[in-house]
From Swiss-Prot:
Annotated compartments: Cytoplasm
Pfam families, per the entry: RhaA
Enzyme class: isomerase
Role according to the record: Catalyzes the interconversion of L-rhamnose and L-rhamnulose.
Encoding gene per record: rhaA
The protein, known as: L-rhamnose isomerase
Cofactor: Mn(2+)
Residues noted as binding Mn(2+) in the record, renumbered to the chain: 262, 294, 296
Amino acid sequence: MTTQLEQAWEIAKQRYAAVGVDVEEALRQLDRLPVSMHCWQGDDVAGFENPAGSLTGGIQATGNYPGKARNAEELRADLEQALSLIPGPKRLNLHAIYLESDAPVARNEIKPEHFKNWVTWAKANKLGLDFNPSCFSHPLSADGFTLSHANDEIRQFWIDHCKASRRVSAYFGEQLGTPSVMNIWVPDGMKDITVDRFAPRQRLLNALDEVISEKLDPAHHIDAVESKLFGIGAESYTVGSNEFYMGYATSRQTALCLDAGHFHPTEVISDKISAAMLYIPRLLLHVSRPVRWDSDHVVLLDDETQAIASEIIRHNLFDRVHIGLDFFDASINRIAAWVIGTRNMKKALLRALLEPTAQLRQLENDGDYTARLALLEEQKSLPWQAIWEMYCQRHDTPAGSQWLDNVRAYENAVLSQRG
């Protein structure tokens, strides 16, 4: 521990103690909050099923930065590099297209054995795993419909894929001793004016009921469903809207996934957390950064990221909210993207934990909105960075921008050698 860091830490502790905040307790609480990193940032959502295929489903990874992972070994190596630069507990979120098999495997026939290497790796790296069926980038999703498809055989294919995915998810939870959150998102929708909006939603409702009909141990597996406003090629109608999935999660008591980019640009998911928590048992968050649409830019330490973190902490939702990330930027170093976004999410959580919430809530209850605003603004100037640097030091990760040196060295030694 350097003298300079220690001095800054002691001064910061005193400053926070003066406003009633126990810094050590804040760091203990931060270690209770894993952030689930998404594997697909590492290869632009290509996966291993058909890496040369086109990305469909109304989503898009833009850019052509060199060095993306081309197989599971490279992706895991890149993830290890990123994980080493991020302090505190982490998880990894996998999509079904990241299976490993010597022979082609139909999506409705995926099995736990196709992900055993991921489980072995997760154990070695002390990570929990989360999962997602991949209802996109496939010939049977080419017309824009999956679980709500009007064709019975195609719809059943996707139902069976999601059922198989749930068993993989439960396998993760059983093997790793921490429940896997499996999120169902489908791109189903239409480009232009839609006459029958009801029938596809009825089919989606029935399909989801069939998907979750097999009872699985909640200690191993948690179901989540995710809405979206629109996607490329589905601008006019999305079957799985916010209202649809809010109703589904409430009536079926599944988890609800709120993605920061899946709403109108003037909406924020931070304001939806407390409302949803009144009706559903759990929330899954996909923290992202939409720029004018669901662009999935790298997460910043901006107002909305901070507001999301503050909602979790202020309402003590540690055990009911699962924090995941969802962005994919192919225009910058992909490892740096992981590190920047995940560290920013953790910084936001730390800043929320360092807030004198009880004092602020009392001012609010007393109607002293002047003092509430004044103290909210003054606390932004408190030396949270010194606390963050100590947290990084305790977890053997770089405290400041020194992590970029590690990324550059890895880029020169490893990424630059890839075709």
